[in-house]
Amino acid sequence: MAKKDEHLRKPEWLKIKLNTNENYTGLKKLMRENNLHTVCEEAKCPNIHECWAVRRTATFMILGSVCTRACRFCAVKTGLPTELDLQEPERVADSVALMNLKHAVITAVARDDQKDGGAGIFAETVRAIRRKSPFTTIEVLPSDMGGNYDNLKTLMDTRPDILNHNIETVRRLTPRVRARATYDRSLEFLRRAKEMQPDIPTKSSIMIGLGETKEEIIEVMDDLLANNVDIMAIGQYLQPTKKHLKVQKYYHPDEFAELKEIAMQKGFSHCEAGPLVRSSYHADEQVNEASKKRQAQA
């Protein structure tokens, strides 16, 4: 555990092999030409080279590139956002079709400045992808939309293949890590989503290494399961800049393997756990696992 003002040395298992082949450069060019944003770039995701260069997948970030919140773990720009871009859904859908994606992940900055929290644009993006790529599965990753469940219903009525909303950290650390969100609101958001569309898998993720205990991580598992969450992801918190929260601990891959085993024993349909795991990491595999489990239970 890190002491005050002490920076931990990044361990060997977190060193990433950079791959910038033609898939990577082509995808980056496509994003710029269509004036699109990805959370891969904006949040400095450590898996960007694997996903773009090897798997040729990306997580689109809609509603602009400026977030109305300032969570202390997140590298996305914060401030006063620009007006909503009503053409954004079509551009995202065109890119999904051009890339011939099997699975598309759509996330967004928080838009607390908008009455609908951006739900209308979010929903139209899903519908546009359905029209142009009917065989592409779609995962949506919204903010808590300020706890407005009419806005959540707008999104759930489009019937995405997975609803993903991240609880991010343990209950005790939530006020320090994401001051404008609450632990219980995130749980209720996930529960309401499942109530609205019981057959659609729900998913949530946490970052560890912020000073939580193993018991608190297991408490998160229990809380998510109590609110009918199907899929969980657990990854290592990495400090994006010196202005963000410091890493308190780097977990060994064996510790992640143990947490995954506990999560699966507790009843999640799928758990992705590892030092470089992020919310949408191997998302295409997760939707397949959830679908198989639903079919087996039918």
UniProtKB/Swiss-Prot annotation:
Its main location: cytoplasm. Residues 53-269 form the Radical SAM core domain. Pathway: Protein modification; protein lipoylation via endogenous pathway; protein N(6)-(lipoyl)lysine from octanoyl-[acyl-carrier-protein]. Binds 2 [4Fe-4S] clusters per subunit. One cluster is coordinated with 3 cysteines and an exchangeable S-adenosyl-L-methionine. Keywords: 4Fe-4S, Cytoplasm, Iron, Iron-sulfur, Metal-binding, S-adenosyl-L-methionine, Transferase. Pfam families: LIAS_N, Radical_SAM. Its EC number is 2.8.1.8. GO terms for molecular function: 4 iron, 4 sulfur cluster binding; lipoate synthase activity; metal ion binding. SUPFAM superfamilies: Radical SAM enzymes. One of its GO terms (cellular component) is cytoplasm. NCBIfam families: lipA (TIGR00510), PRK05481.1 (NF004019), PRK12928.1 (NF009544). Belongs to the radical SAM superfamily. Lipoyl synthase family. This is Lipoyl synthase. It comes from Bacillus subtilis (strain 168).
